[in-house]
């Protein structure tokens, strides 16, 4: 970090010190400043016409583009499709507002339960004490697997990857964090696929195709069972050594009333997903409850994900009206829907792939399995995997190469096993 002082002298009087204007930039990263002014180190007087606020703004823009790359890509695709179609007025009609509203309600209630501290308390009870490494690692992997069925895969990882870090460090097993974090990412993706609210693409498909809970469970429960067995077997690779695991939780930070409020809102949201209660009513109840009792949660909602969905709805709607895309994607989804969904997820992530491909098929079964299994594979196949990687990289001694290597091995083996099961169950030889 460097502290930079820039003297801007009037061009008409370069030797006059009375006309100097002083700008002080403190704590500007040297590499950031070097990108703006490559020769600043050798320049005694920098004649520049911008202030520190501009640098800070540019830094925020770069950070946003990096952290919300999927949203930016979705927005670019939506704008490009509108430019080609020329039908800007029709754009809002392409957006499935029911899905957006339900996502908002679920994210709000889940965020409230997470902030209440209950998940951390549950983790403390399950992990702390005299434990074997194998049992601790299995518990750390099982928690996001089951939690993701209710609180979505990304929230499960946000809650339990830091728990894994603290638990393993307290026992001196931090070298095993890479494998545990990778297995947690896989567990969250595969556990979340079992329920309609386990991940965003499930909610979208369940809502769009008006599925029953029985149909949904029948399609994915076999894969969930196999996933749990494979994750349990993977945990056998950890040793059987003992250690005392200590996981401290601030008891004062646990808010049971907040948890009760958001658990009730979550139950209402699930009823709206199941079409028991009209979603506009639940949306009003959730928004009013947050405004009156817990306004902080408004800041915890992933608005970027909501905007990403809206952009891909617009993009998908425009693509569906283009004859060339109808022929291409319609043909692929007609001949190989599961494989097309799986491969598309590897390239553009499974949530965008779901929204895009849904406009070209009524075969919800193959689409659902394809995008859920498509969460395995490349790091960008599922946003939850990127969350796990980002959380891991914030730990001490994090090794990106080790994570990517472990991720590639585990995901390849898991995906291969899931594809074999799919072939055994649904492919007619």
Model-predicted regions and their roles:
Residues 97-99, 128-141, 170-180, 256-260, ...:
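Membrane-interfacial loop-to-helix junctions in multi-pass transporters
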Residues 94, 116, 120-123, 265-362:
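Transmembrane helical segments that form the transport core of multi-pass membrane transport proteins
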Residues 140-142, 146-190, 355-369, 423-427:
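Hydrophobic transmembrane alpha-helices that form the pore/transport pathway of multi-pass ion
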Residues 61-66, 89-99, 213-223, 252-254, ...:
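Interfacial loop-to-helix junctions that mark the boundaries of transmembrane helices
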Residues 172-240, 245-250, 367, 389-418:
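Membrane-core helix-loop-helix motifs of multi-pass transport proteins
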Residues 58-84, 96-108, 259-268, 276-291, ...:
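Hydrophobic mid-bilayer segments of alpha-helices in multi-pass membrane transport proteins
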Residues 124, 237-263, 295-299:
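Flexible interhelical linker loops that connect adjacent transmembrane helices
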Residues 217-228, 339-429:
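C-terminal transmembrane helix pair
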């Amino acid at each position: 970090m460097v502290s930079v002082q820039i003297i801007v002298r009037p061009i008409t009087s370069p030797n006059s010190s009375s006309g100097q204007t002083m700008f002080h930039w403190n704590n500007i990263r040297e590499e950031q400043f070097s990108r703006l002014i490559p020769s600043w180190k050798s320049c005694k007087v920098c004649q520049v016409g911008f202030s520190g606020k501009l640098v800070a703004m540019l830094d925020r823009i770069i950070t946003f583009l990096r952290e919300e790359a999927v949203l930016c890509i979705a927005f670019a695709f939506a704008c490009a499709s509108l430019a080609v179609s020329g039908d800007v007025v029709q754009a809002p009609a392409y957006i499935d507002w029911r899905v957006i509203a339900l996502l908002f309600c679920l994210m709000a209630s889940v965020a409230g339960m997470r902030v209440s501290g209950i998940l951390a308390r549950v983790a403390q009870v399950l992990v702390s004490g005299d434990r074997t490494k194998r049992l601790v690692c299995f518990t750390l992997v099982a928690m996001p697997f089951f939690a993701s069925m209710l609180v979505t895969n990304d929230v499960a990882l946000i809650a339990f990857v830091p728990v894994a870090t603290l638990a393993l460090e307290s026992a001196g097993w931090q070298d095993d964090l890479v494998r545990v974090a990778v297995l947690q990412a896989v567990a969250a993706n595969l556990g979340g696929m079992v329920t309609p609210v386990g991940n965003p693409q499930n909610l979208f498909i369940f809502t769009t195709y008006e599925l029953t809970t029985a149909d949904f469970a029948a399609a994915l429960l076999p894969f969930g069972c196999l996933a749990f067995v494979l994750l349990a077997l993977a945990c056998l690779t950890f040793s059987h050594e003992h250690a005392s695991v200590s996981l401290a939780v601030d008891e004062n930070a646990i808010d049971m009333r907040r948890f009760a409020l958001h658990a009730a809102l979550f139950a209402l949201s699930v009823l709206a997903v199941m079409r028991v209660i009209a979603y506009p009513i639940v949306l009003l109840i959730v928004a009013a409850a947050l405004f009156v009792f817990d306004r902080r949660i408004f800041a915890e909602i992933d608005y970027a994900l909501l905007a990403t969905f809206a952009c891909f709805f617009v993009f998908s709607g425009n693509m569906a009206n283009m004859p060339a895309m109808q022929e291409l994607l319609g043909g692929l989804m007609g001949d190989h829907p599961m494989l097309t969904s799986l491969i598309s997820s590897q390239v553009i992530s499974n949530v965008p792939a779901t929204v895009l491909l849904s406009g070209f098929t009524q075969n919800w079964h193959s689409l659902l399995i394809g995008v859920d299994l498509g969460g395995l594979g490349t790091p960008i196949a599922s946003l939850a995997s990127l969350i796990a990687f980002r959380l891991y990289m914030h730990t001490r001694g994090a090794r990106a190469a080790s994570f990517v290597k472990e991720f590639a091995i585990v995901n390849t083996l898991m995906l291969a096993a899931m594809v074999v099961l799919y072939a055994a169950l649904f492919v007619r030889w």
